[in-house]
Amino acid sequence: MSRKQQLLKRHRRLKRLGLLAGLLLLLVLGVVSWWWLPLLLLPLVWAAHEAWFADHLFYSPGEDYQYRFGEQTREAATSLSDGLLATDAQLAGDETLVLEIRVKSGWLGRFVDPRVELLDGEQVDQQTFERGADGLRFLNLTGLGGALSAGRLRLRGRYCRLLGAPRLWITPHSELRRRRIMVIAPHADDAELAAYGLYSQADEAWVVTLTAGEIEAEHYQQMGLAKAEAARLKGRLRAWDSIAVPRWAGVPESRCVQLGYFCLQLPTMQAAPDQPAASREADMADIRPFRRFNPFPLPADADGEPTWNNLLADLRALLEMAKPEILVMPHPTLDPHPDHLCAQAAVLEALKGIAWQPSTLLCYANHLHDNDRWPMGDSGDGVALPPQLSAEQAWAPCSLPLDLPTQRDKAMALGMMHDLQPPAPFKRRLRRLLQRYLAGRQPSPYGENEFFRKAVRRHELFWRREL
């Protein structure tokens, strides 16, 4: 069981205990007072829970975030006085800038998401944190270096205060878009969620998707399909998405590859490298039907077996063919999804068997262990650094600013992804309605799926390491 599954299991157990205690309290209240009072309070208590206590937050918001940025990143003297941020550092304006500062929620910040506004004249960014936040947080100032150097950048807390002496961390700019890039996507849409802005602006980009993403096809079962048939249809659609959607960004289909391995089976493959791991739901043990859109043959096409050794052979062939200078893939500790962990492990293992080696790793996190809402806040906001409560590894932050047209193009790319199109369940829509009017949370203008809010932002955030 993964750490996230353990945290979720504990969260649900505590929630059941809290629900039982609440029901007992209402029952006692009905006995000692008016019998109808619990019936009146029950829907109000449920609405309050959905509005303010339904987030999957598996840590205390009073804890400090902790980061080590490594040798590429330097600290610069900075000060915050009457909301004006100042530094003596000489900035070119294109660096990745991270401000470490203590954020303390006010009493309203326990019911409305606290946020920090970054003000440069009429230009406004805002970055949002957990309700009740009271600890060190890391603001992303990338793209605001000019305003900071000119002494125009102001910070203002909404439903929170900024305390203590800030620390400014500067990572020098590295021109990523002029180098050959390969984005490793465990599933169709991972490349777009994490790196659409990067790969759409790169001179030469490859998008390699590892799995067909065929499971959890209930939406297609509603069309009258059996479970296995629905899974096969979903896999075919997502395989098509992985080849077709990057074309919207200008990536030719000759550099888009779908490997067709089965969703959530990469850990099983890794555990027994020469043993096939069939699909959980599609009643298939041959990956070739999901690879038929590929522009050229790959080693695993010979037998179509979903094995770890075949995956490594496919990756080695692609790496030797593309010779990427930059590899973009899931972060090994921040992103807990089993397929994401195995994807980065497979790439690193494949690199050991070939002569060509990339110069730079860029890692992303589309999921977190302990906060399902990160990046917090609304579409179009900046992306503050995610919660990390222990700094075990040193990675340099690397943030790419996205202008509004690029954000809109990214939203359209996500909208083309079939897995992000089905409507949300009624309970989730009702929860969002309550949160909108009781907690001030705004829906994304681009789409109903939560990833439109999370991914269509002012920044794309990566973690960089030179090899």
PLM feature spans:
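Terminal non-domain segments
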Residues: 357, 362-364, 372-376
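Active-site rim/loop-helix segments in enzyme catalytic domains that contact anionic ligands
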Residues: 2-321, 344-356, 363-367, 392-396, ...
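Short His-Asn-centered micro-motif
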Residues: 184-187, 330-331, 338
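Short, catalytically relevant binding-site loops at active-site mouths
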Residues: 333-335, 368-371
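Active-site rim elements
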Residues: 228-232, 331-337, 394-403
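Lipid deacylating catalytic domains
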Residues: 332, 401-404, 459-466
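Proline-aspartate-enriched helix->loop->beta-strand connector
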Residues: 315-333, 340
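PAPS-dependent sulfotransferase catalytic core
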Residues: 370-405
